[in-house]
């Protein structure tokens, strides 16, 4: 209303907030609950990491990293063992399922936002500990799944399981999300198998009252359909793909896809030298009406002979960038479209084997004028 730019608006809001805070410091502060709960902090770490990544706000990402490092130093009392809370310099009470699961999820979010492998390593440690500490190995209708507390805890007459959502997502749902994420980001098949076992153990309850299990159902979709958003993982975590769209003043746009591969891995070029190889290819998904691709610039491939193949191969094995020119259709009506679905087909190979072909659907944020 006053003709302010977005940056000017935020500066003005920050100034108002600072003035209010300075005024508030002149009055007695209310008492504060100083407990640092591991599960709740794990949720906040996820939120900060995702917000910092999506909004390009380094303050949020830095706060998530500080919180994660503090928890790792204070509530992780031994490898694979975390406490429920931290208070007055002490880590107290054995961690519950939700503590391991939510903190692990926060560490995965930090790995996604930064690409730093130590966050993924920490998340794997918690996921492995979660399964060994809370899994119900009993067979039968009531067996399987995860207990809320330690399997070795005999202080209760029964061992409850946290499956349905309440004010927060259930510990089981958080564990499912963690395992599904690690199944995409690592080459360890056990994570996917454990995630499927969780779904199977809860299937009877979910079928009876699905409305009580929204987080679990979202986790099931994540496990079966893969990730959503502009960042995806393929080749058992060996390939990391990120996409973005740069709008142009003309109404057209440029789609940029960056592909990073772990050492020892490659994907076939867009035009392989052999007809039987699966090419790397980009196209718009079927539910992206109103746009078409005018042209795609694929990177120049390397032509190499590898140990498992006598013939030369045209491949991408380092950081590779694909750029596509997007042009709107004349009668396009969704000018405020928020996401553009883009398909990337590829087949990844290591030193001794090739994995099955994969098709990823990247939901790329996009606002056009």
Where do the PLM segments sit?
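Glycan-recognition and catalytic cores of secretory/periplasmic carbohydrate-active enzymes
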Residues: 1-243, 249-258
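Extracellular/lumen-exposed scaffold segments
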Residues: 192-193, 206-369
């Amino acid at each position: 209303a006053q003709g302010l730019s977005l940056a000017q608006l935020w500066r003005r809001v920050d100034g108002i907030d600072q003035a209010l805070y300075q005024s508030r410091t002149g009055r007695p502060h209310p008492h504060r609950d100083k407990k640092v709960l591991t599960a709740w902090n794990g949720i906040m770490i996820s939120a900060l990491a995702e917000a910092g990544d999506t909004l390009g706000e380094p303050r949020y990402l830095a706060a998530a990293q500080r919180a994660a490092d503090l928890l790792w130093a204070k509530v992780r009392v031994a490898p694979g063992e975390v406490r429920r809370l931290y208070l007055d310099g002490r880590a107290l009470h054995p961690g519950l399922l939700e503590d391991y699961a939510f903190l692990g999820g926060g560490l995965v979010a930090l790995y996604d936002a930064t690409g730093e492998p130590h966050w993924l390593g920490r998340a794997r440690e918690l996921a492995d500990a979660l399964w060994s500490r809370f899994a119900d190995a009993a067979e039968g209708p009531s067996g399987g799944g995860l207990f809320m507390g330690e399997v070795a805890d005999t202080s209760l007459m029964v061992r409850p399981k946290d499956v349905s959502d309440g004010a927060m997502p259930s510990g089981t749902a958080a564990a499912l999300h963690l395992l599904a994420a690690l199944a995409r980001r690592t080459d360890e098949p056990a994570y996917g198998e454990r995630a499927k076992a969780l779904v199977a153990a809860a299937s009877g309850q979910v079928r009876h009252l699905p409305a009580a299990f929204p987080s679990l159902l979202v986790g099931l979709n994540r496990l079966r359909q893969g990730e959503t958003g502009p960042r995806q993982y393929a080749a058992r975590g060996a390939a990391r793909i990120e996409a973005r769209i740069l709008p142009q003043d003309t109404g057209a746009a440029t789609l940029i896809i960056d592909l990073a591969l772990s050492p020892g891995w490659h994907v076939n070029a867009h035009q392989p030298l052999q007809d039987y190889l699966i090419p790397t290819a980009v196209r718009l998904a079927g539910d992206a009406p109103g746009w078409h691709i005018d042209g795609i610039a694929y990177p120049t491939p390397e032509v190499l002979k590898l140990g498992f193949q006598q013939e030369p191969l045209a491949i991408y094995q380092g950081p590779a960038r694909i750029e596509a020119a997007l042009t709107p259709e004349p009668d396009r009506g969704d000018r405020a479209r928020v996401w553009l679905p883009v398909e990337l087909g590829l087949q990844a190979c290591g030193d001794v084997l090739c994995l099955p072909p994969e098709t990823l659907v990247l939901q790329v944020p996009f606002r056009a004028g």
